[in-house]
C-alpha cells in the first residue's frame, strides 16, 4: 500500500478539515433542542440517533488526511465513552475548538511545544475546578435527574434511579429488549465479575459491542485450556445440544482459542471464552461460587474431573450471559436456591472464623456478589430502530448515573465550563508567550458546548455564553425553557466524571495534533481502468 506524506501546513489543514467534519455532524445533537442524525449503514436499516459516540463511530472520510483528523477526534469520543459512558459530544466539541485555535496559532508561527504546555496546565486547572464545584449525589431524585438529562426521558430517569436503589451504586444494571412495547424494570439474581471476552470476535451485538448468550452451556475449568484434543469432545457436547457455550478458565490459548474464534466467525457455534478473575485461592473460591450459581461442575484434575472425559453433565447454565470487553454478567443461573443459600451460609461462617482482615474483606465481597441482584431494564418500543435507539439512551443514562454517584455533579448545559473558563483566563496571566496562548485557547474552547446548546435552541450563542459566565456556580442557561436559573435545582446536571474525562481526552488529542509535523497515511488505491467487460469489485 503506498503511503502519502504531507508536512506541516498541508498535513494540519487536512487534519483540521476532518476534525471539523466529524465535530459538525455531532454538534447539532447537543442540548435538549438538539436534532437527531440519521446514519445510513452499509447494511441493515438506517439508525436515527442523538448519541455522539454512535455518530462518531460511523464517520469515515475519503480523503486520507481528513480521515486522520476525524479518527483522532473519534478516539476522543470513544475514550470518553469508555471511561464515563457519556459526554462524547462535549468532548468532541472541546477537541475541535482547541485544535482549531491551536492550529491557527501554529500557522502564525507559535511554538507547538509551548502551546501544549499551556493546554496541559490549563487542563489540570480545569479538572481541579470541576472537582471543587462538585455537588454530591445521594438521593434517588438526584440520580433520576442525571439519568433524565442523559436520556432526555423522565421515564428512563426514574427506572435507572429505581434500579440503582435496588442494587446499590456499585451494583449491576443491564439493558435488554423487552418482548412488548412496554419498558419496565426487573431485578433478578445475577453475578458479575471484571473480566471480559478473550477475543472481540466473540461479540454478537455490534451496536453495543457485547457478546450475549441466551441459555448457554457454561463450562468452568480450573486450569488453562491449551490442548485441542482434550477440549474438542466437550465442545462437541455443546454443539450436539445446540447451545451457545461460555467458557471460564484460568486461560484459553493456542488452538482451542483459535477453534472458538473460527467457529464464532463462521457462526457454526456461539462461544465466548473468559479468563477467570483473581488469583490463587481467591480464584479457586470464586470459581466454586460460580459452579453453585450456575449448577456446573468445575473441571479439575486434582479432584479427578478431567477435561477430556467430561460430558454434558459438567455444564451449568443461566438465562443469559452478557460479556463486554471488561465484564461478565451471568443472570439467573440455574443453580438451586437451596445450594446458593448453603454456599452463602458457608461464606458467612468463613467471615466469622477468620482473623485476617484481608480474607474477611474478600469473603464479604464474595458474599455480596452471591447475594447481589442484577437490575435489568427491559426496553420496549414499537419498531426495531426505535428499540435500538432507546437501548443506547438507557445505557448512556445508566453510565451517567453511575458516574454522578462516584464523583458528584455540576450544573449542566456546559455552564460550569463557561464559568471555569473565566477563572482559567485569570490563571493564564501566570504564563507568557505561546504557553499563555495555549491556556487561552482552552479557555475559549470551554465556552463552546454552551454556545452550541444555545445555537441549537435558536438563540445567539455568544450572548448566552457571556450571560452564563456572569452567573454564580450552579446557575446557567436552561435550553428547554430558554431561561436562566439554578440548574442544579432544576435537575439539569452533568456528572463531574463525564465532564472531566471530556476535558482530559479532548486536550490530550489536541496536543497530539498540534505537535504533528508530518502525517503519513495510506494512499487510496486508484480505481482500476475498466476493460471491455465489467469487473465485479469485492470490497
From Swiss-Prot:
Its EC number is 5.6.1.7. GO terms for biological process: protein refolding. Its main location: cytoplasm. It holds the Pfam family Cpn60_TCP1. GO terms for molecular function: ATP binding; ATP-dependent protein folding chaperone; isomerase activity; unfolded protein binding. It catalyses: ATP + H2O + a folded polypeptide = ADP + phosphate + an unfolded polypeptide. SUPFAM superfamilies: GroEL apical domain-like (SSF52029), GroEL equatorial domain-like (SSF48592), GroEL-intermediate domain like (SSF54849). The keyword Transmembrane does not apply. One of its GO terms (cellular component) is cytoplasm. InterPro entries: Chaperonin_Cpn60_CS, Cpn60/GroEL, Cpn60/GroEL/TCP-1, GroEL-like_apical_dom_sf, GROEL-like_equatorial_sf, TCP-1-like_intermed_sf. ATP binds at residues 29-32, 86-90, 413, 478-480, 494. Disulfide bonds: none annotated. It is found in: Cytoplasm. Keywords: ATP-binding, Chaperone, Cytoplasm, Isomerase, Nucleotide-binding. Forms a cylinder of 14 subunits composed of two heptameric rings stacked back-to-back. Interacts with the co-chaperonin GroES. Together with its co-chaperonin GroES, plays an essential role in assisting protein folding. The GroEL-GroES system forms a nano-cage that allows encapsulation of the non-native substrate proteins and provides a physical environment optimized to promote and accelerate protein folding. Belongs to the chaperonin (HSP60) family. This is Chaperonin GroEL 1. It comes from Corynebacterium diphtheriae (strain ATCC 700971 / NCTC 13129 / Biotype gravis).
Amino acid at each position: 500500500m503506498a503511503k502519502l506524506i504531507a508536512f506541516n501546513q498541508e498535513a494540519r489543514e487536512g487534519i483540521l478539515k476532518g476534525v471539523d467534519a466529524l465535530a459538525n455532524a455531532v454538534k447539532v445533537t447537543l442540548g435538549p433542542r438538539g436534532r437527531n442524525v440519521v446514519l445510513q449503514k452499509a447494511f441493515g436499516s438506517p439508525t436515527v440517533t442523538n448519541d455522539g459516540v454512535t455518530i462518531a463511530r460511523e464517520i469515515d472520510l475519503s480523503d486520507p488526511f481528513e480521515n486522520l483528523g476525524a479518527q483522532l477526534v473519534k478516539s476522543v469520543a470513544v475514550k470518553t465513552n469508555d471511561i464515563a459512558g457519556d459526554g462524547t459530544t462535549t468532548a468532541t466539541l472541546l477537541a475541535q475548538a482547541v485544535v482549531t485555535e491551536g492550529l491557527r496559532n501554529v500557522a502564525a508561527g507559535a511554538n507547538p511545544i509551548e502551546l501544549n504546555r499551556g493546554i496541559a496546565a490549563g487542563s489540570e486547572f480545569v479538572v481541579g475546578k470541576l472537582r471543587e464545584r462538585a455537588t454530591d449525589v445521594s438521593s434517588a431524585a438526584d440520580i433520576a435527574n442525571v439519568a433524565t438529562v442523559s436520556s432526555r426521558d423522565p421515564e428512563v430517569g426514574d427506572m435507572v434511579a429505581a434500579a440503582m436503589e435496588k442494587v446499590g451504586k456499585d451494583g449491576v444494571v443491564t439493558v435488554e429488549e423487552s418482548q412488548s412495547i412496554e419498558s419496565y424494570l426487573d431485578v433478578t439474581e445475577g453475578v458479575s465479575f471484571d473480566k471480559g471476552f478473550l477475543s472481540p470476535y466473540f461479540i454478537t451485538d455490534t451496536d453495543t459491542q457485547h457478546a450475549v448468550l441466551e441459555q448457554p452451556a457454561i463450562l468452568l475449568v480450573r486450569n488453562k485450556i491449551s490442548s485441542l484434543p482434550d477440549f474438542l469432545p466437550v465442545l462437541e457436547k455443546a454443539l450436539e445440544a445446540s447451545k451457545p457455550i461460555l467458557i471460564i478458565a484460568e486461560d484459553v490459548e493456542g488452538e482451542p482459542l483459535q477453534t472458538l474464534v473460527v467457529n464464532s466467525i463462521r457462526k457454526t457455534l456461539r462461544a465466548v471464552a473468559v479468563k477467570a478473575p483473581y488469583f490463587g485461592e481467591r480464584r479457586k473460591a470464586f470459581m466454586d461460587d460460580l459452579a453453585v450459581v450456575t449448577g456446573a461442575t468445575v473441571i479439575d484434575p486434582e479432584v479427578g474431573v478431567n477435561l477430556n472425559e467430561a460430558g454434558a453433565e459438567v455444564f451449568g447454565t443461566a438465562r443469559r450471559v452478557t460479556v463486554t470487553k471488561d465484564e461478565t454478567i451471568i443472570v439467573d443461573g440455574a443453580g438451586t436456591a437451596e445450594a446458593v443459600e448453603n454456599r452463602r451460609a458457608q461464606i458467612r461462617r468463613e467471615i466469622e472464623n477468620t482473623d485476617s482482615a484481608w480474607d474477611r474483606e474478600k469473603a464479604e465481597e464474595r458474599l455480596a456478589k452471591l447475594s447481589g441482584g442484577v437490575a435489568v431494564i427491559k426496553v420496549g418500543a414499537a419498531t426495531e430502530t426505535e428499540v435500538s435507539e432507546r437501548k443506547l439512551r438507557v445505557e448512556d443514562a445508566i453510565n451517567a448515573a453511575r458516574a454522578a454517584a462516584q464523583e458528584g455533579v455540576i450544573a449542566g448545559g456546559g455552564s460550569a465550563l463557561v464559568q471555569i473558563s473565566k477563572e482559567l483566563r485569570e490563571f493564564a496571566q501566570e504564563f507568557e508567550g505561546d504557553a499563555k496562548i495555549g491556556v487561552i485557547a482552552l479557555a475559549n474552547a470551554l465556552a463552546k458546548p454552551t454556545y452550541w446548546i444555545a445555537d441549537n435552541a435558536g438563540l445567539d450563542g455568544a450572548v448566552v455564553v457571556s450571560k452564563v459566565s456572569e452567573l454564580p456556580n450552579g446557575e446557567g442557561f436552561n435550553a428547554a425553557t430558554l431561561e436562566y436559573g439554578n440548574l442544579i435545582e432544576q435537575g439539569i446536571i452533568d456528572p463531574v466524571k463525564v465532564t472531566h474525562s471530556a476535558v482530559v481526552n479532548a486536550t490530550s488529542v489536541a496536543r497530539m495534533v498540534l505537535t504533528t509535523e508530518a502525517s503519513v497515511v495510506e494512499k487510496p488505491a486508484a480505481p482500476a481502468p475498466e476493460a471491455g467487460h465489467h469487473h465485479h469489485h469485492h470490497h
